[in-house]
């Protein structure tokens, strides 16, 4: 305790990638950009005659990346001890991409829609059919099954199906290999 591991990880995350403001803990808004942080560290490396580190830091800036910071204790589902870390990482990754991380099978449904180019249209269609935005309805997906199926059929051009969300729940699995 108190050795600075968390502090080191936060510093590295700001060096290795942009940290989106919405992913920073509330009250801890970054006051410097990634570029400013890296240049500060480069100056410190150069003042210690460590040109190799300064060069590596400069090179890091040329690699577009996003860092995702989160408190694993807040995101982990303690009821699933065997896969607690995996599901915490999947949840945070889904949330960072705008999907519903609180419910992994709803997030999988959203990912599938997005990967096939239907997600934005689906959200609009769902709102028209259900009378509420998808961002609100997805947390109650089981209650909106008919509207989800109708919106899905409208945007994909496929016949209307029953219980899409239930099928996602029944078939959802996640392994470390799937996530990687």
Walk through the language-model features, giving the residues of each.
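P-loop NTPase motor core
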Residues: 2, 7-141
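Conserved helicase/translocase P-loop NTPase motor core
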Residues: 145-180
């Amino acid at each position: 305790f108190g050795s600075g591991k968390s502090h080191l990880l936060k510093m590295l995350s700001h060096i290795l990638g942009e940290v989106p403001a919405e992913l920073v803990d509330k009250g801890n808004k970054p006051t410097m950009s990634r570029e400013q942080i890296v240049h500060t560290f480069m100056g410190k490396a150069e003042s210690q005659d460590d040109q190799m580190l300064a060069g590596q830091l400069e090179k890091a800036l040329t690699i577009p990346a996003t860092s995702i910071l989160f408190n694993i204790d807040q995101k982990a589902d303690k009821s699933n001890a065997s896969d607690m870390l995996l599901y915490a990482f999947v949840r945070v990754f889904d949330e960072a991409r705008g999907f519903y991380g609180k419910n992994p099978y709803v997030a999988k449904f959203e990912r599938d829609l997005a990967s096939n180019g239907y997600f934005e249209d689906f959200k609009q269609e769902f709102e028209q059919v259900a009378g509420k935005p998808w961002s609100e309805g997805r947390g109650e997906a089981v209650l909106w099954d008919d509207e989800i199926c109708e919106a899905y059929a409208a945007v994909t051009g496929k016949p209307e199906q029953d219980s899409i969300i239930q099928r996602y729940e029944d078939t959802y699995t996640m392994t470390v290999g799937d996530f990687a």
